[in-house]
């Protein structure tokens, strides 16, 4: 199972939000590049980056920082936040981003997702953020009446293979991920699902890893606040999921 330490960017700094609220942002790193380097030193090979300014403004804000993260860390980076055009996807991929995560456009303009998959293949990942099973968009500010599973199945039809699933109610709360909903979504959709939101203990990762070993299509997990607060180290987390890098 693949582990993605997370860096959320706000005004060029590494922050974490509580349940997606911009007003509840805690700064954990004035220099995101240093945060990424530390992740690399502990054995990471991947990084999950969210441009929070872009998610709320719907336009790129932190590209210079993203480029520095890629160049200085050597990590495989996936980026989400405010990506709503093919041109924007191409810009990020040219920067060296491995995968782009599409959220709002999957709901608003699904035909754009289809074009993106045709053009960029598996570099396109869908991000489904849900609360009480219903999809939220626009940086989580707006809740829809669309069920997470229904959206996942629609995306599968247009060729999407990878999905990041976030239970908003768990994000940044250190209450544990919604494993039941995540596993159910993976089983019923058949997509490769990355679990996001709420990982607080190594046991959370063990439970996800056990499901993956049983054949559930869980590609990995995103870990954020637990790393910043010292709940466990990234090296410990990597050992749990059986992903070791550089002999760590």
Swiss-Prot record:
Subcellular location as annotated: Cytoplasm
EC numbers listed for it are: 5.3.1.16
Which top class of enzyme applies to this chain?
A: isomerase
GO terms (molecular function) for this protein are: 1-(5-phosphoribosyl)-5-[(5-phosphoribosylamino)methylideneamino]imidazole-4-carboxamide isomerase activity
Predominant place of localization: cytoplasm
The record places the active site at: 8 (proton acceptor), 129 (proton donor)
Q: Which SUPFAM superfamilies match?
A: Ribulose-phoshate binding barrel
- Species annotation: Desulfitobacterium hafniense (strain Y51)
UniProt cross-references to PANTHER family, sorted A to Z: 1-(5-PHOSPHORIBOSYL)-5-[(5-PHOSPHORIBOSYLAMINO)METHYLIDENEAMINO] IMIDAZOLE-4-CARBOXAMIDE ISOMERASE
Cell inner membrane as UniProt keyword: no
Q: Which Pfam families match?
A: His_biosynth (PF00977)
Name of the molecule in the record: 1-(5-phosphoribosyl)-5-[(5-phosphoribosylamino)methylideneamino] imidazole-4-carboxamide isomerase
Q: Which reaction does it catalyse?
A: 1-(5-phospho-beta-D-ribosyl)-5-[(5-phospho-beta-D-ribosylamino)methylideneamino]imidazole-4-carboxamide = 5-[(5-phospho-1-deoxy-D-ribulos-1-ylimino)methylamino]-1-(5-phospho-beta-D-ribosyl)imidazole-4-carboxamide
Which keywords does UniProt give here? Amino-acid biosynthesis, Cytoplasm, Histidine biosynthesis, Isomerase
In the UniProt record, does the keyword Glycoprotein occur?
no
Q: Which GO terms describe its biological process?
A: L-histidine biosynthetic process; L-tryptophan biosynthetic process
Q: In which pathway does it act?
A: Amino-acid biosynthesis; L-histidine biosynthesis; L-histidine from 5-phospho-alpha-D-ribose 1-diphosphate: step 4/9
Q: Which family does it belong to?
A: Belongs to the HisA/HisF family.
Annotated InterPro entries: Aldolase_TIM, His_biosynth, HisA_bact_arch, Isoase_HisA-like, Isoase_HisA-like_bact, RibuloseP-bd_barrel
């Amino acid at each position: 199972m693949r582990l993605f330490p997370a860096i959320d960017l706000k005004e060029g700094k590494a922050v974490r939000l509580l349940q997606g609220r911009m007003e509840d942002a805690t700064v954990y790193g004035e220099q995101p590049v240093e945060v990424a380097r530390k992740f690399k030193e502990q054995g990471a090979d991947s990084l999950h980056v969210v441009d929070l300014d872009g998610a709320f403004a719907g336009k790129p804000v932190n590209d210079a920082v993203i480029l520095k993260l890629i160049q200085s860390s050597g990590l495989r980076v996936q980026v989400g936040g405010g990506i709503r055009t093919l041109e924007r996807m191409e810009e990020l991929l040219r920067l060296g981003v491995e995968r782009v995560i599409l959220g709002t456009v999957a709901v608003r303009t699904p035909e754009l997702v289809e074009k993106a998959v045709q053009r960029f293949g598996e570099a396109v990942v869908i991000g489904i953020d849900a609360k009480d099973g219903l999809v939220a968009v626009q940086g989580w500010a707006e809740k829809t009446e669309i069920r997470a599973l229904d959206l996942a199945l629609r995306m599968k039809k247009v060729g999407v293979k990878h999905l990041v699933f976030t239970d908003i109610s768990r994000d940044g709360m250190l209450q544990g991920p919604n494993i039941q909903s995540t596993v159910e979504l993976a089983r019923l959709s058949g997509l490769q699902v990355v679990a996001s939101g709420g990982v607080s203990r190594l046991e959370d990762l063990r439970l996800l890893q056990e499901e993956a070993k049983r054949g559930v299509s869980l590609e990995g997990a995103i870990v954020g606040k637990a790393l910043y607060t010292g709940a466990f180290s990234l090296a410990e987390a990597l050992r749990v999921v059986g992903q070791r890098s550089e002999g760590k």
